[in-house]
Amino acid sequence: MTEPVAAEVGRDFIRDIIQADLDQAKYREIVTRFPPEPNGYLHIGHAKSIALNFGIAQEFPGRCHLRFDDTNPVKEEQEYIDSIQADVHWLGFDWGKNLFFASDYFDRLYEWAETLIRDGLAYVDDQTQEEIRTSRGTLTEPGKNSPFRDRSVDENLDLFRRMKAGEFPNGARVLRAKIDMAAGNINLRDPVLYRILHAHHPRTGNAWCIYPSYDYAHGQSDAIEGITHSICTLEFEDHRPLYDWFIEKLPVPSKPHQYEFARLNLTYTLLSKRVLTQLVREGHVAGWDDPRMPTMAGMRRRGVPPAALREFVKRIGVAKANSVVDVGMLEFCIREELNRTAQRRMAVLKPLKVVIENYPEGQTEELEAINHPDDPSAGTRKITFGRELYIEQDDFMENPPKKFFRLSPGNEVRLRYAYFVKCTGVIKNESGEVVELRCTYDPATRGGNAPDGRKVKATMHWLSAAASKPAEIRIYNQLFANPSPDASNFAADLNPQSLEILSNARVEASVAESNSTEPMQFERQGYFVRDKDSTPGKPVFSRTIGLRDTFAKEVAKG
């Protein structure tokens, strides 16, 4: 299990409210909660809520509950419950013994529903879902009372108990709160509290065939658990009067209060569950953990460090108004963390063979390479140098422009940790493509410096042809080419270059043979992580992020 991390202390309007509540001795302990519905995978927007709620509980201190809002058995699966718990732990937080489910409270919620009926505050409605929707009115027109609104308490209790007993089919009846069909806030126009749903529940089995609505279950679950600050995103602001109405009318054991903050919106990103589901179902991505997905599973597979996500959430802060955050800020946080923690290795993504003609045939030597330039404790490793090497295709040009300083005919460059080499010949295939270079090396320049003081303007990475291993490299870019993709027609904004697969790459032998899932920097290329699709003899590495933002520049150029 992941060790809990220390919360980053940051000031915002929610923390200011909590501090004021503590200063006034309003609460002895702060209790927050993260309440996901187990009907899908968490995404980066949820990471903001997780870090906020768990961070507050650590900072003040207090406790944060993980509570699953499992009130819709048709959409909920154990797979999602497991993945959500794994995501919270991966992000660096732990709920300890405070794991709860809304279904834990089904009996009490039912009893309180009967309380509302007895108090004349709820009734059974026989209207269809469409009739209820139509009769609620609009923002400018009041709703119309249901013809069943004035049923007696006894009749409502009888019908509600028969609903619970399973006498009626799905959709035949609902239980509604009796509030005000002319209320300016449509959420107060007799909202549905219970609906009939004959479906197997992951935890309660077939014990229930009526299920509470989110609006009814949510606040009462908070009250049962002693939540002091119920923090949610802005789309629930209009639901707060209903939240408070239930708390006021029912004999709940505590009086929580709801606070709203701005949800996370990112450029080049859509977080709608509908869109993410379509992306998976329609085959635009290879599953919920596809590294292009904004899901936490996708980011974890891509090698994004959880510390980078926590830092990103800290930087964007907690606000009252919605805004769009440039994805470049997230990428900056990822690069900063990986630059600090990732060990360095060498990989050649598009190999071009080099033969060092004056290097003895059959001879090899071991050179020392540093694992991290800023962390001496990371140590060094041995890399093999020999007569035949690989360099990047892009590091050679036969007819280079004026400011191209890498390898070209007659030009000398430094091979990192090795020697100066000079290109003396070019071999092409029948199509005129360069397939091999002939070079010479200067034995006196071992380690990268010339005794005579001559300088070179380029240092290139390389690999031994004999000592390196084949690998598949997956270069991921933004899933959408449009910085503001259209959720209603997202397919039109998909980036056709979001994935490039390089099947003939080469990596250091130790990299190919290691099963480590820690991200590493392939020097001059970017940060990469071993993918779960790796097989014996054919490792697969996914790019977490490049060393610099090139995608935005390509988009700008059109």
UniProtKB/Swiss-Prot annotation:
GO CC terms, sorted: cytosol
Amino acids binding L-glutamine: 69, 214
Recorded superkingdom: Bacteria
Gene3D superfamilies linked: Glutamyl-trna Synthetase, Domain 2 (1.10.1160.10), Glutamyl-tRNA Synthetase, Domain 3 (3.90.800.10), HUPs (3.40.50.620), Ribosomal Protein L25, Chain P (2.40.240.10)
Entry-linked PROSITE patterns: AA_TRNA_LIGASE_I
Disulfide partners: none
Range of residues in the leader sequence: none
CDD domains for this protein: GlnRS_core
Complexes and interactors: Monomer.
Family per record: Belongs to the class-I aminoacyl-tRNA synthetase family.
Protein name: Glutamine--tRNA ligase
Native organism: Bradyrhizobium diazoefficiens (strain JCM 10833 / BCRC 13528 / IAM 13628 / NBRC 14792 / USDA 110)
Gene: glnS
